[in-house]
Amino acid sequence: MMTRVFLAMFFLLVLTKGWPRLYDGDCTRGPNMHITCFKDQSCGLIVKRNGRLSCTLNCKCRRNESCLPSEEVDWDNRNMKIVICPKPWF
């Protein structure tokens, strides 16, 4: 019975709010994207664009390594280009 209630509530949420977006291509990336992992994990950054949409960019990384090791940061303009982060939509 609880499974049916959960599924009904989930589909009602999808109908009213829309399917959740896994990745937004227009997501702005900030200057603090250099993240070091403390254990084997998936890490990333969550930012907001125009105060509205939350976006997530995830990368796999290993202990004591930078999650995004090949970024190019222009600290004056706060722009960043990610070179080898695979599939930012998982």
Curated annotation (Swiss-Prot):
Post-translational modification (record): Contains 4 disulfide bonds.
Secreted among keywords: yes
Tissue-level expression: Expressed by the venom duct.
UniProt KW Iron-sulfur keyword: no
Signal peptide: 1-18
Gene Ontology cellular component terms for the protein in this record: extracellular region
Compartment annotation: Secreted
GO molecular function, one term: toxin activity
Keyword terms: Disulfide bond, Secreted, Signal, Toxin
Main localization, broad class: secreted
Family from the record: Belongs to the E superfamily.
Record note on domains: The cysteine framework is XXII (C-C-C-C-C-C-C-C).
Protein's recorded name: Conotoxin Vc22.1
